[in-house]
């Protein structure tokens, strides 16, 4: 279900959190939609269930998902979850852009990266 490529530069725990957050912010995962079981996700990714459980716990702590005992984990209701993801992404982008500016990356290079991510210029 999740598009995770097991990037060696980022922990799998963080990749799971990022991917679920991305799917929520895009509306692909809808409010009250059940997430795959921890064991199912772990088996699909070939990782420890503990890693998935820790990622789900972090997502729950951030308010993006909620868990029901013996029933599973679900996407939180309302716009708060998507807004939280967008705010976190915006802050991460600000930090990355500050670092880029401090290290001499120019505006044209930043624009090229944005075009690469969001598609061609309008």
Q: Where do the protein language model's features map onto the residues?
A:
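A short alpha-helical element within helix-turn-helix/winged-helix DNA-binding domains
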Residues: 34-45, 59
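Short, hydrophobic-biased segments on the C-terminal half of alpha helices
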Residues: 20, 56-57
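Short, Lys/Arg-rich nucleic-acid/phosphate-binding segment
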Residues: 35, 67-75, 79
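Extreme N-terminal segment that seeds HTH/winged-HTH DNA-binding domains in transcriptional regulators
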Residues: 1-34, 40, 84-122
């Amino acid at each position: 279900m999740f598009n995770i490529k097991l990037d060696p530069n980022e922990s799998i725990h963080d990749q799971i959190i990022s991917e679920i957050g991305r799917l929520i912010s895009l509306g692909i995962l809808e409010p009250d939609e059940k997430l795959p079981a921890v064991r199912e996700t772990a088996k699909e990714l070939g990782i420890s269930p503990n890693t998935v459980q820790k990622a789900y716990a972090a997502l729950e702590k951030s308010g993006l998902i909620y868990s029901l005992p013996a029933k599973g984990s679900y996407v939180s209701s309302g716009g708060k979850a998507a807004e939280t993801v967008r705010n976190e992404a915006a802050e991460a982008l600000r930090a990355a852009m500050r670092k880029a500016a401090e290290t001499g990356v120019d505006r044209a290079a930043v624009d090229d990266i944005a075009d690469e991510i969001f598609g061609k210029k309008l």
